[in-house]
Amino acid sequence: MCKFIQNQYIYLGMIVLMLLLTSDICRAEFTIEDENKLGREFYEQLEQHQMILHNKVLTDYITGIGNLILDQTTRTPFKFNFFILDSSAINAFATPGGYIYINKGLLLVAENEAQLAGVIAHEIGHANARHVASIISKSQKLNMAALAAMLAGVFLGGGGEASAAITAFSLAGSSSMTLRYMREHEEEADRLGIDYLVHAGYNPSAMVDFLKIMKQYEFLSKTMPSYLQTHPGTDDRIIYMDGLIMTRYRQPGKNSIIGNLCRVQASVPLSASELSRRQRQLETSLAKDPQNTDLLYNLAMIEDQLGANSSALEHLQKALVQSPDDHEILKSIGLLHLKTGRYEQAQDYLLRAKKSDP
């Protein structure tokens, strides 16, 4: 069974686990303690199935963004934790207890830090508003199929056999009430998220820009990205947030605060098929912006992993023309020369990299 479909069955199993764990809790108030316990159980299942990427560069980056956003909130019910999941599906979600998960697929399609920050701010909004607790508390008004639909909408996404199975099961028992709850939650998470984003200093339009990118993916591929499957009402959300930006958040913000997203993306571990797909994506982007230093660097790193050393060196040299004192570019050229046995050139570039180390 391919890893993608296998992961979908794991998610499905976790949803069943959540249903079982909450069946008794549903009869009473779903407390902060209950949320912490459920969130921890979900996290441990992800760890057990090796679905979390333990990559310091990636984790530090999203945690830095998350903490910057959390500094703008007046009250948070949880101690938040941020993780990258080893999934190429373009998705993100928050589980009970303040656990925020970003799929590596989403990390790779975001065009700048502000767009990624918008996704994280939205998920923090879900957690702070305790939307999963609200779903479970309302479950007395829903049958089990409708509750499964809502939990699947929060956590699953991504297509595949498991997604199709849970969707078919869920729709059979869901109702307009289910959809209304989900749309209300999305609107509240957007309202909270864009406020967090602005006060953190980011460009508020980035949230809308990311949704438009997802709509473009849907148009080009004829399939709906996981993020749109699990975050309904996209067109309405775009209109709503555009209105907020025009009336309340007109001040410009920054697209990058913590660090250069494009350089961070180069640290995302990819399978052979993912490397080839990423190479095509970067080549398409570079055709539109051939002098972009970050795109040249990122493409070179992919080519290096694919064994295309000559192409990698060519793109690094082009990047160096644009940014002659760039530490990472100089170091990468030196290491590439070292790998191919050009020791004198390697020494030269590595010494230059050392001198340029910020």
Residue ranges and their predicted role:
Residues 11-22:
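Bacterial N-terminal signal peptides
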Residues 26-30:
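Boundary at the C-terminal end of the N-terminal hydrophobic targeting segment
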Residues 40, 52-54, 60, 176-328, ...:
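Extracytoplasmic and endomembrane cell-envelope/extracellular-matrix remodeling and assembly machinery
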Residues 84-98:
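Catalytic zinc-binding patch centered on the HExxH motif and its immediate surroundings
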Residues 102, 118-126, 130, 189:
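Active-site recognition of the HExxH zinc-binding catalytic motif
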Residues 104-118:
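Short pre-active-site segment immediately N-terminal to the catalytic Zn-binding motif
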Residues 114, 124-141:
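Catalytic Zn2+-binding segment of zinc metalloproteases
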Residues 141-159, 165-177:
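Membrane-active amphipathic alpha-helices enriched in small hydrophobic residues
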